[in-house]
């Protein structure tokens, strides 16, 4: 394999994290098994191409020598005459179309599912939607929702996530119960905005202030993101979070450099202003002394004339 034991263990741990989160990156587990993501975020194809070819089949050029076009059905057939499930389904579809044109009855399905099963599944789904809607109303959100409306499944699922008693929001509130800023951020994420009073030390003009998600600090948002990733450790989201952290670190370092340069320029300007002000004050005193000397000289000349 040409890989060290540590890299193999890291890959296994990543697969385990993906399985425990019940999420498989599109297009699914086959893609995860075949495509290996390196640490720098690039896809690597080492042994995976060979495995894919082995599972998928032979080379496309070789496939043309194994199949031929049926002149009657205009579909591909194996040259050796062997048939599989696809051939059976294709033939069954043609027979059903022909029988319908002739007015014959359709063939019975291979597996027959009783109608009672579908009715029971439908009733259970309605019951689940009703229970979710009741919990949604009990939480004080959306009292005008019709409990008989079956189109509220998406709303109910979102409610489960943002429920005050259970769900991700409740877990995050318990985790950051000592952090007021993140608690306000969670409220803004849940309701779109949060209103803060001057009691919380936010406003200085004795007025309320409305904060949106973008008004919170980047450090708090990234801290909350890391906490969510601990609950849902998917490789794709981890990679995106690492990129956000890297970009934030770069921007933060650049801003610190710019602030240091600005402070240095301010200090230089203040120093120059002090020097210029001291020069101006010195020249002003000298001018006053010169005027006084001129007055004294004039008085002396007048005294001489009078004498």
Curated annotation (Swiss-Prot):
GO cellular component: cytoplasm; DASH complex; spindle microtubule
GO MF assignments: microtubule plus-end binding
Coiled coil: 234-307
Keyword Cell division: yes
Tagged with keyword Nucleus: yes
Pfam families for the chain: DASH_Spc34 (PF08657)
Biological process terms in GO annotation: attachment of spindle microtubules to kinetochore; cell division; mitotic sister chromatid biorientation; positive regulation of attachment of spindle microtubules to kinetochore; positive regulation of microtubule polymerization; protein transport along microtubule to mitotic spindle pole body
InterPro entries: Spc34 (IPR013966)
Positions of disulphide bridges: none
UniProt keyword terms in alphabetical order: Cell cycle, Cell division, Centromere, Chromosome, Chromosome partition, Coiled coil, Cytoplasm, Cytoskeleton, Kinetochore, Microtubule, Mitosis, Nucleus
Compartments where found: Nucleus; Cytoplasm, Cytoskeleton, Spindle; Chromosome, Centromere, Kinetochore
Family statement: Belongs to the DASH complex SPC34 family.
Subunit structure: Component of the DASH complex consisting of ASK1, DAD1, DAD2, DAD3, DAD4, DAM1, DUO1, HSK3, SPC19 and SPC34, with a stoichiometry of one copy of each subunit per complex. Multiple DASH complexes oligomerize to form a ring that encircles spindle microtubules and organizes the rod-like NDC80 complexes of the outer kinetochore. DASH complex oligomerization strengthens microtubule attachments. On cytoplasmic microtubules, DASH complexes appear to form patches instead of rings.
Entry protein name: DASH complex subunit SPC34
Source organism of the structure: Candida glabrata (strain ATCC 2001 / BCRC 20586 / JCM 3761 / NBRC 0622 / NRRL Y-65 / CBS 138) (Yeast)
């Amino acid at each position: 394999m040409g890989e060290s034991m540590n890299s193999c263990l890291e890959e296994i741990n990543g697969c385990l994290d993906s399985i425990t989160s019940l999420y498989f990156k599109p297009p699914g587990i086959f893609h995860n098994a075949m495509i290996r993501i390196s640490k720098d975020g690039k896809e690597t194809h080492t042994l995976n191409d060979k495995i894919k070819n082995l599972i998928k089949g032979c080379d496309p050029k070789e496939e043309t020598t194994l199949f031929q076009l049926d002149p009657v059905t205009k579909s591909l057939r194996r040259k050796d005459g062997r048939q599989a499930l696809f051939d059976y389904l294709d033939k069954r579809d043609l027979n059903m179309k022909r029988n319908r044109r002739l007015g014959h009855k359709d063939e019975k399905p291979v597996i027959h599912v009783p109608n009672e099963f579908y009715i029971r599944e439908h009733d259970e789904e309605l019951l689940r939607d009703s229970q979710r809607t009741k919990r949604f109303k009990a939480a004080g959100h959306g009292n005008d929702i019709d409990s008989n409306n079956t189109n509220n499944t998406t709303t109910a699922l979102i409610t489960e996530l943002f429920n005050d008693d259970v769900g991700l929001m409740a877990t995050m509130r318990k985790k950051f119960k000592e952090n007021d800023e993140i608690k306000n951020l969670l409220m803004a994420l849940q309701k779109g905005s949060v209103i803060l009073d001057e009691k919380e030390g936010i406003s200085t003009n004795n007025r309320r202030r409305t904060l949106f998600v973008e008004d919170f600090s980047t450090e708090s948002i990234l801290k909350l993101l890391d906490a969510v990733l601990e609950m849902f450790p998917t490789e794709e989201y981890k990679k995106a979070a690492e990129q956000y952290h890297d970009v934030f670190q770069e921007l933060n370092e650049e801003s610190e450099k710019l602030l240091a340069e600005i402070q240095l320029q301010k200090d230089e300007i203040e120093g120059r202003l002090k020097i210029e002000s001291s020069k101006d004050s010195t020249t002003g005193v000298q001018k006053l002394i010169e005027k006084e000397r001129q007055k004294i000289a004039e008085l002396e000349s007048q005294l001489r004339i009078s004498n």
